[in-house]
């Protein structure tokens, strides 16, 4: 990372030895920048969470209703606690939203983004029933790869760091000790030969390219070396005078203008998987020993397949330093024992870092399930001679391994699950919204005539220009209800798991635009359904206990109407189940607290105004594209998909990817 002030501490005897000195400890404190002060439930929540962390309580839960400003509360906690922080979200889209929010709150500190760098990923697998081997197929997004490197480089060089990550942060990553040890520092006045610098850059996976400079590459012109580190946008220019570093400066990549001079610059490796040469040799020896042990355990075909593949991979590693699927040998390169956990992003943090798990009721189950899913896929690869058993150790963390990092944890959720409640020393509530919006009124009505009744309610809200959501228990009921409403001249659509992502997004967009008035669905808890135009929610068969009718699910469904100041919710039930009682009581408790706050502060709640996004493409348009034009259209769409991913607009990137797949199928069908 770049530093423009004088270094502290003496340069080690080996001029390329990593220095982890006072610069790390002297990094600036967090500085929260915001136009507003904590309000509503926020001040008390901030105070309690900070108090719990200072008292060394490892687990706390922030129970915050939608729209109460949970992210702002967490930002205030980070600002006071001043520890490097990891925020985990359960998908890329939510991670991108949090990343942008934290960047606005902390413009003077390092806010980084760490998610899977694949725009498209087909894992390696083998289907024994069909005798079908599926090779790994992936499309890496270079911008996200750059952001991942920036995250680890920041963690190595300063304390004022917030990393927003998806659950991919528990997957294997290069050894942080190697990443740190193989980096090197250059200072103005250093005695060093140009050849030494170039060799060191090659050692840490930089590529020389004198024509096209991009992250992870360098070029050489006489005594000037231009580098773009893998985690950087601009050029770092090293100017030598003989065998001495004469000048180090940052140069704008686009204009070529010098932006600033610096006293020194620390160059981290261009990739996370970097292995010192001596360790590479010993790792290859261990891999060959494992191969010899494994071959007698396999059949003739499988042993031949494994031997041929492994020897080829070792030859590639010796020649080029890498091979396809090198991560499957990571246990040997990391010198880990069989079954020992892999290194991951969490190992780049200091021991006492702050961990925030957003939407914990969804994120914790994801973290639980990662390991088993990975192992079951690899089992057939190992059993049939496509991979050595050590491939099992290229894996995500087991949940019990992840728990060992949970020393300062804040779970954030509107509906915390049993895990969070059982582990937390305190559950801090954040019920009052600074905006004044109140949870909707909830009414329970009998099952008899529920369809006719819900239809009457829909007509009322349509007259005032609002929309409605209706939840059913099965896909068949959703389709039948939609058809019944249509016959009664109510514009309705249904939404369920069979509908593709791109169509689902477009259905929600058309609901907001008023092209239809009612959306009928089964599980309306998924992201993307925060629709302020919704003024009524009807929950059919609410007394049928189960996943979609338990108290947590009911509270979440009711919360979908909390963005509209005049919204109402009706539950249709003959039996007041414990789940219904709990959901109604909790909603009424939250309503009364918010109403009292509004009256005390003279707040009149108003419906949230949320812009409606432009349509990306019309999927029906593909039928009208001439077959000869499809390849060019795919090229254009691929560029659009990458641009969307670069902007962290993953919803749009997924839409375009789905369209590309549709067009590729049409080409194959010709």
Curated annotation (Swiss-Prot):
- Which cell locations does it reside in? Cytoplasm
Q: Where do we find the motif Beta-hairpin here?
A: 117-140
Which residues are recorded as binding ATP? 64-71
- Residue ranges of every copy of the Helicase C-terminal domain listed in the record: 453-612
Q: Where is the UVR domain?
A: 631-666
State the superkingdom: Archaea
What are the UniProt keywords, alphabetically?
ATP-binding, Cytoplasm, DNA damage, DNA excision, DNA repair, Excision nuclease, Nucleotide-binding, SOS response
Cite the Helicase ATP-binding domain residue spans from the record: 51-433
> Gene3D superfamilies annotated for this entry?
P-loop containing nucleotide triphosphate hydrolases, UVR domain
Q: Which SUPFAM superfamilies does UniProt cross-reference here?
A: C-terminal UvrC-binding domain of UvrB (SSF46600), P-loop containing nucleoside triphosphate hydrolases (SSF52540)
Q: Which Pfam families would you find in this protein's record?
A: Helicase_C, ResIII, UVR, UvrB, UvrB_inter
Report the PROSITE patterns cross-referenced here.
HELICASE_ATP_BIND_1, HELICASE_CTER, UVR
The record comments on the domains as follows: The beta-hairpin motif is involved in DNA binding.
Q: Which NCBIfam families match?
A: PRK05298.1, uvrb
Summarize subunit and interaction data from the UniProt record for this chain. Forms a heterotetramer with UvrA during the search for lesions. Interacts with UvrC in an incision complex.
Q: What is this protein called?
A: UvrABC system protein B
Q: Which organism is it from?
A: Methanosarcina mazei (strain ATCC BAA-159 / DSM 3647 / Goe1 / Go1 / JCM 11833 / OCM 88)
**Which taxonomic lineage does the organism of this UniProt entry have?**
Archaea, Methanobacteriati, Methanobacteriota, Stenosarchaea group, Methanomicrobia
């Amino acid at each position: 990372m770049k530093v423009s002030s004088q270094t502290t501490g003496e340069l080690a005897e080996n001029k390329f030895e990593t220095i982890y000195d006072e610069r790390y400890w002297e990094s600036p404190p967090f500085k929260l920048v915001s136009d507003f002060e904590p309000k509503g439930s926020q001040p008390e929540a901030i105070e309690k969470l900070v108090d719990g962390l200072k008292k060394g309580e490892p687990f706390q839960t922030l129970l915050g209703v939608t729209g109460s400003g949970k992210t702002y509360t967490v930002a205030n906690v980070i600002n006071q606690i001043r520890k490097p922080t990891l925020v985990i979200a359960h998908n890329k889209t939510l991670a991108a939203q949090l990343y942008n929010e934290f960047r606005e709150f902390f413009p003077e500190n390092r806010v980084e983004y760490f998610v899977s760098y694949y725009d498209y990923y087909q894992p390696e697998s083998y289907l024994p029933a069909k005798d079908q081997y599926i090779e790994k197929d992936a499309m890496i997004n270079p911008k996200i790869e750059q952001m991942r490197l920036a995250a680890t480089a920041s963690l190595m060089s300063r304390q004022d760091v917030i990393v927003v990550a998806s659950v991919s942060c528990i997957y294997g990553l290069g050894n942080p000790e190697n990443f740190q040890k193989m980096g090197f520092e250059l200072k103005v006045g250093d005695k060093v030969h140009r050849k030494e610098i170039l060799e060191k850059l090659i050692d840490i996976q930089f590529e020389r390219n004198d024509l096209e400079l991009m992250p992870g590459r360098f070029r050489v012109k006489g005594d000037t070396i231009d580098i773009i580190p893998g985690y950087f946008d601009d050029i770092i220019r090293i100017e030598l005078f003989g065998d001495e570093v004469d000048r180090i400066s940052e140069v704008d990549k686009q204009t070529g203008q010098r932006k600033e001079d610096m006293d020194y610059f620390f160059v981290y490796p261009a990739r996370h998987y970097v292995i010192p040469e001596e360790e590479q040799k010993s790792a290859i020896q261990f891999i060959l020993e494992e191969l010899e042990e494994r071959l007698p355990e396999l059949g003739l075909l499988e042993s031949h397949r494994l031997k041929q593949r492994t020897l080829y991979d070792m030859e590639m590693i010796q020649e080029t330093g890498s091979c396809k699927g090198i991560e499957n040998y990571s246990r040997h390169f990391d010198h880990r024992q069989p079954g020992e956990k892999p290194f991951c992003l969490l190992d780049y943090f200091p021991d006492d870092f702050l961990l925030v798990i957003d939407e914990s009721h969804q994120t914790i189950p994801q973290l639980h399930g990662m390991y088993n899913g990975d192992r079951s896929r690899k089992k057939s690869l190992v059993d049939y001679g496509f991979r050595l058993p050590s491939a099992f150790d290229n894996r995500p963390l087991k949940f019990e391994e992840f728990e060992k990092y949970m020393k300062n944890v804040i779970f954030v959720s509107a509906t915390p699950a049993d895990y969070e409640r059982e582990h937390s020393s305190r559950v801090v509530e954040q019920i009052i919204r600074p905006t004044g919006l109140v949870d909707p009124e909830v009414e329970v009505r009998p099952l008899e005539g529920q369809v006719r009744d819900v239809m009457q309610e829909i007509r009322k809200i349509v007259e005032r220009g609002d929309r409605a959501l209706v939840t059913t228990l099965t896909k068949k009921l959703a389709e039948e209800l939609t058809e019944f409403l249509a016959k009664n001249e109510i514009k309705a659509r249904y939404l369920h798991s069979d509908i593709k992502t791109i169509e689902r997004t477009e259905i929600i967009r058309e609901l907001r635009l008023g092209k239809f008035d009612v959306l009928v669905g089964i599980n309306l808890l998924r992201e993307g359904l925060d629709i302020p135009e919704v003024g009524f929610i009807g929950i059919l068969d609410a007394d049928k206990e189960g996943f979609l009718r338990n108290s947590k699910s009911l509270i979440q469904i009711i919360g979908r109407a909390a963005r509209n100041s005049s919204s109402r919710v009706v539950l249709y039930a003959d039996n007041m189940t414990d789940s219904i009682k709990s959901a109604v009581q909790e909603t009424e408790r939250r309503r009364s607290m918010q109403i009292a706050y509004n009256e005390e502060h003279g707040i009149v709640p108003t419906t949230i105004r949320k812009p409606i996004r432009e349509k990306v493409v019309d999927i029906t348009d593909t039928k009208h594209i001439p077959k000869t034009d499809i390849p060019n259209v795919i090229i254009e769409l691929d560029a659009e998909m990458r641009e969307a991913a670069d902007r962290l607009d993953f919803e749009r990137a997924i839409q375009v990817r789905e369209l590309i797949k549709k067009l590729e199928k049409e080409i194959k069908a010709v």
